[in-house]
Amino acid sequence: MNQVNNVVNFNLVANVTKFLYRSLYLILAAALASAAPAHAQERPAPAPAPAPAPAPAPAPAPKNAQPVTPQPDGSHLVPEGVKESTPAPVENGSSDNNAAPVPEGSSLPEPAPRPALVDTSINPNPPFTPGSMQSLEMEHEGKTRRYLLRIPNHYSPEKAAPVLFGFGGWGDSPENYSSYARMQTTEANNEAIIVYPEGFERAWEAAPYAKTRDGEDIRFIKRILDSVDKDYHVDRNRVYAMGMSNGGGFTSVLGCHSQDTFAAVAMVSGAFYNPVEVNCADAPMNTLIMHGVNDKMMTYEGGDRHEAGYLPVRTVLGGYLKRNRCDMTFQSTPEAGGSERLSFNGCQKDVQLVKVPQDHTWFWQPDTPNVVWDFLSSKTRV
């Protein structure tokens, strides 16, 4: 009986010992496996996914124009630092502040007229008669473009005629703009070849809704001028531009980039979106700005419209004052309808601002077509 118990005890001890050895082996094997490099493992753990590369920062969008806060004294209506000056009285009725005194009993000589630039390509038999207006088309950079051409009542191949370009607002047809511009009430009707171009899809460059870019519209206008010059006696020294709203903004683009072509520009209720003042040529330009201080569409103080910023009037004016090297002072004179005209001093070329107590429109008071033509027609390029 004792022998049987001894055998049982021996077998039990052997089994326990065998179990302990096997457990110790498995523990050591697991420890070694976890310490082995990944390539030595049977099923290597997947490498951790790399951290996603940070997305590139978007290019900064052009800063929207910062609206100007209206001031009770009206100082927000002119560029910062510009002040009204009181000219010293000048004898003999001269309006030139810098003129030398004229001896008593003598008079100022009449200034010599500037000669018109010679036009050697005059057609003695132009295609359209004086007083007529035609709708014309041309292919330009893959687009069919249209414009109205009006020949002045007093046109003669023997006398060089000024050229006036007129640009309507967004959505305006040339016919519509030529109607409300009322240039037939001015001497331009008798003197000037008037061109009313149509914007592509009735919009002009620099506005966010325009379909033209990178000077396409500027080149279109210069092609029209060259075409007109082939058939008519054009005074290249007296080429002018005027515009309303979006057309006023584009007129400012011409005033900023085409001083080699235009003698003077006039902007009425201009839509001065930010690109209007980008990369302007540093050259003077005779400039008239007329804007309603109560304009609710393109506010005088600047703001945002069509998800784009537009400039305060005083910022656009300030650009012309700088390029004309004005001395940042002005004289103020009253105009019809409670308007005020600011004429700036010391400029290489004439710069004027007419502040009108009205909304976004081509004004009746003051009489916009005559104010515009009286200003433009007195200017020459050289």
PLM feature segments, named:
Residues G199, A266-Y273, G292-D295:
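Active-site nucleophile loop of the alpha/beta-hydrolase fold
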Residues N286-M290, G309-L311, L321-V382:
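C-terminal catalytic histidine-bearing segment of alpha/beta-hydrolase fold enzymes
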Residues V4-Y25:
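Bacterial N-terminal signal peptides that target proteins for export
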Residues S23-S34:
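Bacterial N-terminal signal peptides
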Residues D295-M298, T361-W362:
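Acidic catalytic loop of the alpha/beta-hydrolase fold
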Residues A40-A51, A55-V163, M242, N246-A264, ...:
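A domain-start/cap signature at the N-terminus of enzymes
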Residues Q134, M138-H154, E158-Y240, G249, ...:
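Serine-hydrolase catalytic machinery in alpha/beta-hydrolase-like enzymes
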Residues Y300-L311:
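Short, flexible/disordered intra-domain loops and linkers
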